[in-house]
Amino acid sequence: DAYHDKDKDEWVIEFMPSKDLTHSNGTIIQGGFVSGMIDASMSQFIMYESKGKALPLTLDIDIKFLKSCKPNIKTIAKSKIIRKGKSIAFTNGELYQDNILVAVGSATNKIIQI
């Protein structure tokens, strides 16, 4: 599920990462997939806010891994648009499991009008 939380003005996506996305004997979600969940939330919010008229291209992304992300646990990505102009947007994102913050990220996106 993905939705706009209007009260917090943030984009929320629910994921269920499977054991197929792990390393370390199936116990930890690989960092690239963690990054992808955060990136998806940040990018989708730009698309949602533009009513599908903007395609965000991630120019730069910075992810901080705070705790290990486990498989088969509902995982929530939340994002905010910090600033958006005509051609560039800056976003922040967070990833949670069981209400525990497991990773944070920020990105710079080039906006292509479609």
Task: For the regions a language model picked out, list residue spans one by one.
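Catalytic strand-loop segment that frames the active site of acyl-thioester-processing enzymes
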Residues: 1-29
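Short beta-strand micro-motifs enriched in acidic
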Residues: 3-5, 66, 82
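Hydrophobic residues in beta-strands and at strand termini
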Residues: 15-17, 65, 111
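Compact, glycine-rich, soluble single-domain proteins
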Residues: 26-44, 58
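A generic structural micro-feature
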Residues: 27-28, 53-55, 71, 85-87
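Hydrophobic beta-strand-centered segment that forms part of the acyl-chain substrate-binding groove
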Residues: 43-76
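HotDog/MaoC-like acyl-thioester-processing domains
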Residues: 69-71, 76, 80-114
